[in-house]
């Protein structure tokens, strides 16, 4: 299900003294089945943008097309409920939205709200709990007895139980330790590959953006500043830093090595493994002479 933004503008508190423009002139497409990252400094428009993906917000101007659904200024999409089933959104700290007596009831809430029978919803809950790497015996427990990481996975299972075609992730690893962050990101990537889900990730973690995303959209002051592959986007390191966007640690180390040893590493290195390989290649080609001078 392809998603397209066409000249999208959004203003909060439109036509009031408190009006504030959050998005303008946003033209971007998310072809079906891809993995995308949206990055940018705080306040750049990332969260406002993704709230247009399932009709939580409506453009002030322009059009958002999500498959066969069109959302535009002044026109209400009649099938928002169906759209929200197709586009699952995992907001920051989704575990705060858990409320039922048991894990099973919490996961079943979405499917039953969309008209699925109780028996079918329970089957979806069993499948979803396994998709997020938890044991089915947790279904009978209260979600509030679980660890923070388990609660987050339960909340994500509730989104997956509705079988979305698009999974939107707004800082999904916020507050987790490094091990938990890595496990969750690997889980999302596995779902993307095995289920063919379109994934749209909003993140401040540049390592995650570089590692997982096929395309990266850089937002700045409410519009698209840069778009391309990780290699293309992070080749504009100086420009990104000027607008407050962090760089992957491998690029920071690359700069430090170049400055320290007076060598040039031409390739954009997006992982420490890439950086190690490129440093070895440069030294083999004679870069070590620069190091010793």
Swiss-Prot record:
The molecular function GO annotations come to: ATP binding; ATP hydrolysis activity; ATPase-coupled transmembrane transporter activity
Q: Which residues form the ABC transporter domain?
A: 3-246
Gene name, per UniProt, is ecfA2
InterPro entries membership: AAA+_ATPase, ABC_transporter-like_ATP-bd, ABC_transporter-like_CS, ABC_transpr_CbiO/EcfA_su, ECF_ABC_transporter_ATP-bd, EcfA2, P-loop_NTPase
- Tell me its EC number(s), please: 7.-.-.-
PANTHER family in the record: ENERGY-COUPLING FACTOR TRANSPORTER ATP-BINDING PROTEIN ECFA2 (PTHR43553:SF27), HEAVY METAL TRANSPORTER (PTHR43553)
Assembly and binders: Forms a stable energy-coupling factor (ECF) transporter complex composed of 2 membrane-embedded substrate-binding proteins (S component), 2 ATP-binding proteins (A component) and 2 transmembrane proteins (T component).
Family, per entry:
Belongs to the ABC transporter superfamily. Energy-coupling factor EcfA family.
Keywords linked to the UniProt accession: ATP-binding, Cell membrane, Membrane, Nucleotide-binding, Translocase, Transport
> What GO CC annotations are associated with the protein?
ATP-binding cassette (ABC) transporter complex
Q: How does it sit in the membrane?
A: Peripheral membrane protein
Query: So what does this one do?
Result: ATP-binding (A) component of a common energy-coupling factor (ECF) ABC-transporter complex. Unlike classic ABC transporters this ECF transporter provides the energy necessary to transport a number of different substrates.
What is the protein's name according to its record? Energy-coupling factor transporter ATP-binding protein EcfA2
- Which residues participate in ATP binding? 40-47
Compartments (UniProt record): Cell membrane
Species in which this protein is naturally found: Bacillus cereus (strain ZK / E33L)
